């Protein structure tokens, strides 16, 4: 459904994540995420608000090859659902890390979502590797 003018109040515009059925990428759902303010972070975590991302034919390849190449492991979802990775830009909005400061921007691999909780490792002035256990072998 497309809307013009003001967005009706019944459309949630909070924190979300887009998921697809891994075996049928035409079937999608949007799940609501908790507010980043409600998250309990450890000292080695940070929250990156995803500001923009690109969606191209290449992202469909990520979905089609998700099981073969391991793309579904990057951002795990429940059951038969998966989260297709996208390239985008995000801003740190909360951090227990001394290396990642609130306001820092990062270009990287994200889910189609409002934010991502990361476990920064090997941080440099050029960026960082996400040390989350389920992404460890991939990133």
Functional labels for PLM-detected ranges:
Residues 116-138:
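Short, compositionally biased
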Residues 58-63:
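Cytochrome P450 core scaffold surrounding the K-helix E-X-X-R motif
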Residues 7-31:
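Hydrophobic, helix-prone linear segments
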Residues 42-53, 67-117, 122:
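Glycine-rich beta-strand-centered segment in the early N-terminal region that forms part
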Residues 1-12, 56-57:
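N-terminal amphipathic/basic-hydrophobic helices that include classical n-h-c signal peptides
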Residues 22-52, 57:
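A short N-terminal beta-strand-loop micro-motif at the entrance of redox/enzyme domains
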């Amino acid at each position: 459904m497309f809307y013009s003018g003001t967005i009706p109040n019944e459309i949630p515009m909070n924190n979300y994540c887009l998921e697809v059925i891994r075996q049928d990428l035409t079937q999608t759902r949007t799940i609501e995420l908790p507010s980043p303010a409600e998250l309990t972070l450890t000292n080695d975590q940070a929250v990156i608000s995803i500001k923009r991302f690109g969606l191209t034919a290449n992202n469909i390849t990520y979905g089609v090859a998700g099981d073969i190449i391991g793309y579904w492991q990057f951002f795990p979802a429940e059951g038969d659902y998966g989260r297709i990775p996208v390239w985008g830009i995000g801003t740190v909005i909360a951090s227990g890390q001394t290396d990642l400061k609130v306001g820092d921007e990062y270009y990287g691999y994200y889910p189609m979502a409002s934010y991502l909780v990361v476990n920064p490792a090997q941080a440099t002035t050029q960026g960082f590797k996400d040390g989350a256990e389920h992404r460890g072998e991939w990133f």
